[in-house]
UniProtKB/Swiss-Prot annotation:
GO terms for cellular component: cytosol. Gene3D superfamilies: HUPs, Pantoate-beta-alanine ligase, C-terminal domain. This is Pantothenate synthetase. Its EC number is 6.3.2.1. It catalyses: (R)-pantoate + beta-alanine + ATP = (R)-pantothenate + AMP + diphosphate + H(+). It holds the Pfam family Pantoate_ligase. It comes from the Bacteria. One of its GO terms (biological process) is pantothenate biosynthetic process. Homodimer. The active site is at H37 (proton donor). Catalyzes the condensation of pantoate with beta-alanine in an ATP-dependent reaction via a pantoyl-adenylate intermediate. It is an enzyme of class 6 (ligase). GO terms for molecular function: ATP binding; pantoate-beta-alanine ligase activity.
Length: 284
């Protein structure tokens, strides 16, 4: 497995693989790998001949009060896991490499990023779409795999890819869960034992909402009340937002769920200083 740190070497490596008619799949990460990330590699290798992983803790997507400095950095462990999963190359640039002195160009997706994470974390999605655009240009992939857990991020990247005509297929990867249903996340390590035990309330709430919809409930207000009530049953849980949105536009649905439409149920809940995101897709 190659480890590349410079833009020119990464571009040259990808170009040589393309000349050899290899299909390239990229898996962008911030490191601190877990089974969810490794499932992205597995999916990439179903769509491509070669898996490239990027490991970059992106300063542009962290707000001033967020955990950039303490975000876990475990590169040696990550490299070992990536190689075992079948990654052929890791691109691991420094912030100075991607954002040299004088850098001033950013990529912004407007409407999709306005609410929810975009409202609570100003500038976050501008940082995400900027770095992803750069990584597409540097790694030159045919396909790029992103997890469905970060649903608003996935929607923003899909919109960017479409609007800016990136010749990259965006492949969504299903959420990977612990045995008790908690969505795998690099931030789960911040939970203390009591918080970790109660964190299952997110997936439980989604399952309750799915069941209600399967049994005919279509009123959004009623569904949100069901979700909120179950989350509040966990004493340590503090909801940031609970919503049902159109899966493509990410616009909130206010009244009734309609037949032949696709929705996302979104949850973001705080346990102490740790924010956990989860969602489920509803196709009617």
């Amino acid at each position: 497995m190659k480890i590349i740190e410079t833009v020119s070497e990464m571009q040259h490596f990808s170009e040589s693989l393309r000349i050899a008619e290899k299909r390239l799949g990229v898996v962008p990460t911030m490191g601190a790998l877990h089974d969810g990330h490794l499932s992205l590699v597995k999916l990439a290798l179903k769509h491509a001949d070669v898996a490239i992983m990027t490991i970059f803790v992106n300063p542009l997507q962290f707000g001033p009060s967020e955990d950039f400095a303490k975000y876990p950095r475990t590169f040696e462990r990550d490299a070992m896991l990536a190689e075992k999963a079948g990654v052929s190359c890791i691109f691991a640039p420094t912030p100075e490499t991607l954002y040299p002195s004088g850098f001033q160009t950013h990529v912004t997706v407007d409407e999709i990023t306005q609410g929810f994470e975009g409202e609570l974390r100003p500038g976050h999605f501008r940082g995400v779409t900027t770095v992803v655009a750069k990584l597409f240009n540097i790694t030159k992939p045919h396909v790029a795999v992103f997890g469905e857990k970060d649903a608003q991020q996935l929607a923003a990247i899909r919109k960017m890819q479409k609007d800016l005509n990136f010749d990259v297929e965006i492949v969504p990867a299903p959420i990977v869960r612990e045995t008790d249903g908690l969505a795998k996340s690099s931030r789960n390590i911040y939970l203390n034992p009591a918080e970790r035990k109660q964190a299952v309330v997110l997936n439980e709430s989604l399952e309750i909402a799915k069941s209600a919809i399967q049994h005919g409930e279509r009123n959004v207000k009623t569904l949100l009340e069901v979700l909120n009530r179950h989350i509040q049953s966990a004493p340590l849980a503090e909801p940031d937002y609970i919503a049902i949105v159109d899966a493509e536009s990410f616009q909130p649905v206010q009244e009734e769920l309609l037949a032949e439409e696709t929705y996302l149920v979104l949850l973001t809940v705080r346990f102490g200083s740790t924010r956990l995101l989860d969602n489920c897709r509803i196709e009617l």
